Amino acid sequence: MKSLLPISSLLVLLGSASAFAADLNIPMSFEYLALDGKKVESSVFNHKSSLELTPGTHKIAIRYHEMVEDDFSDSQTFVKSAPFIVTLDVDGDYQYYLQAAEGKVVKKPKVYAQNPQIKLTRGDKGDVNFQVVNTNLEEESFVSRLFSGNQAVDVSGTAAAATGAAGAVVAVAPAPVATSATVSATSLTAPVDTSKATAANPQQMLQYWWLQADEKTRKEFMSWAISQL
């Protein structure tokens, strides 16, 4: 019996430790990107509303996203902020709640996305020790990438690296990407040989049809392209 006592005590301690975990809850208009250096699997269509957090200090990369009316059509599109990093000290099995600083309803999503401000509260109304740093890491739009030739920025990957860094949280800036003009100034006015265009790569084809389109058609194309993101 004596040999069983230490084992029983150990099992009780292990059970207590596993039960001692907090939760960070976010509304639908926010999205988890990374936690302590690891990506968080979440998306607009598979929203993750809470993260379980063990005692200690955690770095969580989050961004704001909301569906708004499109400027060019009657359809809707998503507005996304650059990621911001929350450093949160967890000292108990509390329920933490994140929301926009202005309240549950963001009146001007596009303006808010430029500089998202948040507040964190605790379910028991206790004090919350946290810091927030906004980054300047942004995803280049689909249309911009079509005509610049740039590769898409891995926002989640970079955010994961930022949350895994030791020391103070710093703003994350995307690495500069060299770009080159692929459409010359003369091509805006000179006639285009359609037979050559048919042999061009997809990017050149899109550039060709973009130059031929009127303003209304361009706006319709941009609205469609945004809806594909």
UniProtKB/Swiss-Prot annotation:
This is UPF0319 protein Shew185_1615. InterPro entries: UPF0319 (IPR018635). It comes from the Bacteria. Belongs to the UPF0319 family. Residues 1-21 form the signal peptide. Keywords: Signal. HAMAP family: UPF0319. Pfam families: DUF2057.
